[in-house]
C-alpha cells in the first residue's frame, strides 16, 4: 500500500468516535479512514453514511469497516470504545468496566503490528491510557490521551466570554485529570499576549468569579449529559485538532495526557499537561511555573488518578 496516503483509524463507532471522524473528514486530514467496532452492522452503516457525505465534501477520502490486522498500515488510531458515562456518574466510576474493554482492545492493536500514534479518548481517559500503554508496551511518547484538551478549550471559552473577546485570542490550559480534580492554570493564561492575572487585577475580577469559571468548565460535561445523554461534538472537534497536529507534524501545543517522569513533581502516570505534538507523538512537555496552590491541586489530582490506575490494574487481573 502507498505509505504516502494518510490513514486514520477509529476503534469505537459510537457518537464520540464518529464525531471525531467527521471532524477529521471535514478538515481534510486523511485520504483513508477505517472503523473498527464490536458491532459490525454499526461500522458498515456509518461507513455507508460517510460515503454519502464524501460526495458533497471538498476533500477526497475513502472510509470503510476494517479489521485490527489492517492497522499496521495506519498513521493514527483513535480509541473511543467503552461504555458511555451515565447521568450523574463521574468518569472515575467507569474504571473497572472500561479497563477490561481497553485491555482487550490494546492486545488486538498490539497484535496488528501498528506503528503509529495512539490517541485514547475512552473515559476515565488517563487511566485508560495507562492501561492501553501497559498492555501494548508501545513507546510512551507515541501513546497520548485527549487529556485536558477539551477542558482547556472550555476554559478559553469561559475567559473569552468574561472578557468579551474571541476564544482564539486566549491561551489557557487546564491541567490534571479530565474531570472533577482538574486545575485551571490562570497564572499561565494570556489574552493576546497579556497576562490574564494582570487583566484580573485591572478589571477587579474576584477570586470567586475565577472559581465559578473553573466550576463551569469541569461541570459542563455533566450539564450536557443531563440534557442530551452524552457529549460528542466538542470532543470530536478537539480530537481532530490532535490528529491534525500529528499528521502535519505541526508542533502545536495542547493539553493532552502524557506519561510523566518527574515533570510537575509527579511520575509514573498519564495526566493532562501542555504538550508539543508532532508526527511521532510527544515532542516536549511544556513546564509552567505553577503557583503553590495550583501545584498542590495538580499533585492531588495525580494522586487521585494513581489510585484509580491501581483499581484498573486489579480489574484487568480479575
From Swiss-Prot:
Q: What HAMAP family does this protein map onto? A: Lactate_dehydrog
Query: Where in or outside the cell?
Result: Cytoplasm
What PANTHER family would the database entry show? Answer: L-2-HYDROXYCARBOXYLATE DEHYDROGENASE (NAD(P)(+)), L-LACTATE DEHYDROGENASE
Q: Which organism is it from?
A: Mycoplasma mobile (strain ATCC 43663 / 163K / NCTC 11711)
Under which EC number(s) is this enzyme classified? 1.1.1.27
What this protein is called in its record is L-lactate dehydrogenase
Supply the source organism's classification: Bacteria, Bacillati, Mycoplasmatota, Mycoplasmoidales, Metamycoplasmataceae
GO CC terms on record?
cytoplasm
Q: Which UniProt keywords apply?
A: Cytoplasm, NAD, Oxidoreductase, Phosphoprotein
Amino acid at each position: 500500500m502507498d505509505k504516502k496516503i494518510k490513514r486514520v483509524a477509529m476503534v469505537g463507532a459510537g457518537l464520540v468516535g464518529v464525531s471525531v471522524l467527521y471532524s477529521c473528514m471535514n478538515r481534510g486530514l486523511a485520504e483513508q479512514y477505517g472503523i473498527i467496532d464490536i458491532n459490525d452492522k454499526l461500522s458498515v452503516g456509518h461507513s455507508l453514511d460517510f460515503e454519502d457525505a464524501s460526495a458533497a465534501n471538498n476533500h477526497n477520502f475513502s472510509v470503510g469497516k476494517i479489521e485490527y490486522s489492517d492497522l499496521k498500515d495506519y498513521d493514527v488510531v483513535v480509541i473511543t470504545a467503552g461504555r458511555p458515562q451515565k447521568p450523574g456518574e463521574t468518569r472515575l466510576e467507569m474504571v473497572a468496566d472500561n479497563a477490561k474493554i481497553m485491555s482487550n482492545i490494546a492486545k488486538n492493536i498490539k497484535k496488528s503490528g501498528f506503528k503509529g500514534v495512539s490517541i485514547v479518548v475512552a473515559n476515565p481517559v488517563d487511566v485508560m491510557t495507562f492501561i492501553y500503554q501497559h498492555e501494548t508496551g508501545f513507546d510512551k511518547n507515541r501513546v497520548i490521551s485527549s487529556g485536558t484538551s477539551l477542558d482547556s478549550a472550555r476554559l478559553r471559552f469561559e475567559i473569552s466570554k468574561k472578557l468579551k473577546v474571541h476564544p482564539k485570542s486566549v491561551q489557557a490550559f487546564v491541567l490534571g485529570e479530565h474531570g472533577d480534580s482538574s486545575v485551571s492554570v490562570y497564572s499561565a493564561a494570556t489574552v493576546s499576549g497579556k497576562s490574564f492575572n494582570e487583566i484580573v487585577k485591572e478589571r477587579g475580577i474576584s477570586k470567586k468569579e475565577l472559581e465559578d469559571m473553573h466550576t463551569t468548565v469541569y461541570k459542563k460535561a455533566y450539564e450536557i449529559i443531563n440534557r442530551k445523554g452524552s457529549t460528542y461534538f466538542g470532543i470530536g472537534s478537539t480530537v481532530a485538532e490532535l490528529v491534525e497536529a500529528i499528521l502535519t507534524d505541526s508542533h502545536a501545543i495542547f493539553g493532552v495526557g502524557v506519561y510523566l517522569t518527574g515533570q510537575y513533581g509527579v511520575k509514573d502516570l498519564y495526566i493532562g499537561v501542555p504538550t508539543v505534538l508532532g508526527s511521532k507523538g510527544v515532542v516536549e512537555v511544556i513546564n509552567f511555573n505553577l503557583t503553590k496552590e495550583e501545584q498542590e491541586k495538580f499533585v492531588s489530582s495525580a494522586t487521585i488518578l494513581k489510585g484509580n490506575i491501581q483499581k484498573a490494574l486489579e480489574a484487568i487481573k480479575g
